[in-house]
Amino acid sequence: MALELEGQGVFESRGLPVLYCGVGKVNAAYALTRRLADYRHAGRALPHVLNFGTAGSRRHPAGTALECHAFVQRDMDVRGLGVPLGATPFDADIPLRLEFPPVFPQLAQAVCGTGDSFATTECAIECDVVDMEGYALAKVCWLERTRFTSVKWVSDGADSTAGADWQSNLHHAAERFLQLYEHLEEKDS
């Protein structure tokens, strides 16, 4: 999760480890890379990275949990150099859209558009939800060849009321994330 606010203490109250990566792509990439490096330095296998977070959506109503199976950058715009929207220049080995196998069949699948802005207007790139960390986390996992799963709780409509809606939906999101985590733990046991 990006912020302790998103977790509402529900994971910690059960003694579960959580990495809060901070807001935005740079903070997310740094925090996860550092955590994975700690695993490597300790001689441990890389974990299945499970990202829970909130997202805005103009396609799905607030209160919907979605599994993001694909990730794009909604704010990478170098079209002036002839590079497609969402593509990082000179990153030829990285696909425009990062995809991962689904883990939660009970959830609808979604494409997550990540950018370093709190979205309040329509996106220029095709995506179902918008967030500020998903693509960065997905790219780190793709590069490190470790499993990645991301579930987003639609907290707002990515519109003019997004800020207030986001805050009012945090507790519901945290409880749903815990349910999904516990279901995954049971499944893996």
Where are these regions (language model features)?
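Glycine-rich phosphate- or other oxyanion-binding loops that anchor nucleotides, phosphorylated ligands
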Residues: E6-D188
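Structural motif
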Residues: M1-L5
